[in-house]
Amino acid sequence: MATDVFNSKSLAIQAQKKILGKMVSKSIATTLIDDTSSDVLDELYRVTKEYTQNKKEAEKIIKNLIKIVLKLAILYRNNQFNQDEIALMEKFKKKVHQLAKTVVSFHQVDYTFDRNFLSKLLNDCRELLHQIIQRHLTAKSHGRVNNVFDHFSDCEFLAALYNPFGPYKLHLQKLCDGVNRMLDEGNI
């Protein structure tokens, strides 16, 4: 027997997630994301498009990344997480911060790049994220998480991105400049 309990807050969050799922496009996302983050996302799109040689796939990966970040923010800002999820969220934030510092460090310090280490860090973030959103988002959202992390944690992609003589050197420089700004601004 279904209960007839009306919860406007829950309904509002559900509507936000539904609307967000329908409206996320580059132009909408840039109004909800700061300039530095937008620059990093744009650079991630460019390097992904070049690497995959597939504009549509690159757009899908970045759109999925934006949707996940914004849905996570909606859940967080609307206090939807229980104590365990809040603890996981704190671990996730620390892991993302570590990831950001590692991405920059591997670029700045010659001969330190370790694709397996970076891939593992990314996959650790993926697992934490799945645990955080487990009871809140659909299987489709979990698929989006996997789509994003499957691409960015791919060791071949990482090796190509960090190749000091490869075609992505300028992209990596711009990405690291943006991530460094995000670290300086306390946004990551």
UniProtKB/Swiss-Prot annotation:
Location of this chain's protein in the cell: Cytoplasm
Keywords: Apoptosis, Coiled coil, Cytoplasm
Pfam family, one: DUF758
Keyword Coiled coil: yes
Gene3D superfamilies per the UniProt record, alphabetical: Tumor necrosis factor alpha-induced protein 8-like
A cellular component annotation (GO) from this entry: cytoplasm
GO biological process terms held by the UniProt record: apoptotic process; positive regulation of apoptotic process
Coiled-coil blocks: 39-72
GO molecular function terms attached to this record: cysteine-type endopeptidase inhibitor activity involved in apoptotic process
Predominant location: cytoplasm
Family according to the record: Belongs to the TNFAIP8 family.
Function in brief: Acts as a negative mediator of apoptosis.
Protein name, per record: Tumor necrosis factor alpha-induced protein 8
Organism: Gallus gallus (Chicken)
